[in-house]
Swiss-Prot record:
The gene is rpsC. Pfam families: Ribosomal_S3_C (PF00189). Coiled coil: none annotated. Binds the lower part of the 30S subunit head. Binds mRNA in the 70S ribosome, positioning it for translation. One of its GO terms (biological process) is translation. Keywords: Ribonucleoprotein, Ribosomal protein, RNA-binding, rRNA-binding. It comes from Alder yellows phytoplasma. GO terms for cellular component: cytosolic small ribosomal subunit. This is Small ribosomal subunit protein uS3.
Amino acid sequence: MGQKSNPNGLRLGIIRTWESKWYDVDKKVPFLVGEDFKIRTLIKNNYPKSTISQIEIKRLKKSNDEFIEIDLYTSKIGIIQGPENKNKNSLINKIEKLINKKVQINIFEVKAINKIAVLVAQNIAIQLQQRAFYKAVLKSAIQKALKSGIKGIKIIITGRLGGAEKARRDSISMGVVPLNTLRADIDYAFEEAHTTYGVLGVKVIINHGEVLPNKTIADTRQIFSSQYENKKNNNKRHFVDKKNFKKSTS
C-alpha cells in the first residue's frame, strides 16, 4: 500500500532549505537535533496558536563558545516582543536556562497570513475548538487564501466531524495542487484541534506556483504576487457617473 510523503521534506535540497542550519561532528548530531526540538517546543508553548509561522535555528561559534541565533517569522510582532521587549527577553532567558548557551532572537514580520499553510491550519484549529461548523470554516479559509493570489489550496480534516459518533474524513480543494511536481512551491502544514468530542486533524496544502529557474522561493512568490496585483487592478470595473457625463461632439 502506497504511503504519501511530506511535501515539505520531499523538496528539501531541491527548492527548499532546512530550518536548522548548522553542522558538527557525527557524535554530537543526535544531541543537537534533540536540543533544536526542545527549543522549538518551548517557543511554540510560550505563545498562542496562529502567532509564529516559522522558526529557523543557526549555530555559530564565537571565541570557542557556541552561539545560537533564532529567526522567528510572525504575523503578530507585538505579542512576540511585548512592551519594551519584555516577552522577547523573557523567552531568551528561558532558552538560555534550557540549553546553557548564549541566544540571540531576530523577529521578522509576515504580512500575507492567508497564504501561509501553518497560520491557515492554526486558524482553522482555533475556530474548530470554539465549536464553529467545520464546513463554514473550511470554505472561509479557502476563499481568503484564493483572494491573496495563490494557485491552489487543499484542506483535509479528519475525526468526529460535527460531533458524529463515527470518525470520518472530509476535504475541500480549489485550483491546482501538484504534490509530485518537485519544482512546484508547495506549502504544507498539519495541526490538531482538541474539541470536547475528540481530536480533529487538519491538513493544509497550498500551491504558490512553480519556482522559476535561477530564482529562490521568496523571489518567485514576490514575482507572482506582483503579477496578481497588477492583474487585479486591471480587471477593476470603471464606473461612469451618468449625470455628469457629456458626449463629445465633433
